[in-house]
Amino acid sequence: MGYQKLGVNTGHRKAMLRNLVTALFRDERINTTEARAREVRSIAEKLVTDAKQGDLAARRRALAYIYEEDVVRKLFDNIAPKYAGRQGGYTRIVKAGCRRGDAAGMVILELV
């Protein structure tokens, strides 16, 4: 499956997505553009599904992607158990109008 370039080079895109995923799990909601939210949603859903296993390998994979250790701890101790009975669909995208400067479509990405 492909990915969106998001108007930046590869290193910048990867770092930006890691930052957005870290912020999503830390704050449980983020405000961003629609294209970025769709990319972050895909990554976040996979990380939550992985965290539901709760094993050491899953924790190490999460630590390799998420920047902050306390956010990984929160993902495994608080967020993943909350979705134990749910098969996917851990996030929701709500449209939030357009950005003032360039009229980019803004959304709120939040954990359900």
UniProtKB/Swiss-Prot annotation:
Pfam families: Ribosomal_L17. Keywords: Ribonucleoprotein, Ribosomal protein. GO terms for biological process: translation. InterPro entries: Ribosomal_bL17, Ribosomal_bL17_CS, Ribosomal_bL17_sf. GO terms for cellular component: cytosolic large ribosomal subunit. Part of the 50S ribosomal subunit. Contacts protein L32. HAMAP family: Ribosomal_bL17. NCBIfam families: L17 (TIGR00059). This is Large ribosomal subunit protein bL17. The gene is rplQ.
